[in-house]
Design a protein with these regions (language model features):
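Polytopic alpha-helical membrane proteins, predominantly small-molecule transporters/carriers
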Residues: 1-269
């Protein structure tokens, strides 16, 4: 992982502009988590690519080919079917200290495994695994967001200063940002972005069910159907992430371009 390059990146205004475009929806995400569980809210974040495709088509007049249309259809079909049949509910459990500890151990271990896998192999392989590690960190940050909204309802804003959950948002979010930056620099954005948009909702669903008591339909058949719809959604996201039109106009791509420019400047100096 490139700590020295991060220092160069942080001094460039273009990088901060790209970062702000990625974080602009933070407040809306908190508001959504205040109203719904992780298994409902986090999968909706994949609609970023769908709306990007629609904006490119109807606002900027960019022609969308079969790849973009096919990816949008698959993603919408998988996401809509999952939300319709998975019977989300619950999510009212307040995690205890043991629950948080087990979640942190599991997610840190999973992220560490992803990082270790990212240290070797081809550039797409490394980029994908760094992206998966970043997605896990962002899912953990969302879990801390959800818990923080519960704390505010119970004790008001001052209670945030006396609990660890708000600080967990910052720690997990910064870790995710650092890992995502390494993912963008390690290889093609098609690999890193696919990992980010697929692993984040999947990790969030697992955390929501295991930590907050979110409900999915019971039974092997129902769970298999849930898995099939998520697989369909993931396939659509992979198709969209390999679209030159989508990738070259995404906020992540702007971050990559700024970072690569900084890397060249750092090497030249």
């Amino acid at each position: 992982m490139r700590w020295k390059l991060m220092a160069h990146v942080l001094r460039r205004p273009t990088w901060w502009l790209g970062l702000l475009s990625m974080l602009g929806a933070f407040g809306f995400q908190v508001a959504a988590l205040d109203q719904g569980g992780l298994t409902l809210v986090q999968p909706l974040l994949v609609t970023e690519l769908i709306f990007l495709a629609l904006v490119l088509r109807f606002w900027f007049g960019r022609p969308l080919g079969w790849r973009e249309a096919f990816g949008v259809v698959l993603t919408v079909a998988g996401l809509a079917t999952f939300l319709a049949i998975s019977n989300q509910g619950g999510g009212s459990l307040v995690p205890d200290q043991l629950g948080w500890l087990l979640m942190v151990i599991a997610t840190v271990g999973a992220a560490a495994l992803c990082v270790s896998l990212a240290r070797v192999g081809s550039r797409p392989w490394r980029s994908a695994w760094y992206g998966a590690a970043a997605a896990i960190a962002f899912a953990v940050s969302a879990a801390f967001m959800k818990a923080s909204t519960v704390l505010v309802h119970r004790g008001g804003l001052p209670v945030l200063f006396t609990h660890f959950e708000p600080y967990g948002i910052a720690v997990a979010g910064l870790a995710g940002l650092f890992l995502a930056q390494n993912a963008f620099l390690a290889g093609p954005i098609t690999a890193s972005q696919a990992s980010l948009v697929i692993v984040d909702p999947l990790a969030s669903i697992i955390i929501g069910v295991g930590l907050f008591g979110d409900n999915l339909r019971g039974g092997i058949g129902a769970l298999a159907l849930d898995a099939a719809t998520l697989a369909l959604m993931s396939l659509g996201l992979v198709v969209l992430c390999h679209s030159p039109l989508i990738v070259n106009t995404s906020p992540e791509d702007r971050l990559v371009r700024a970072s690569h420019r900084v890397a060249r400047e750092a090497q030249a100096s």
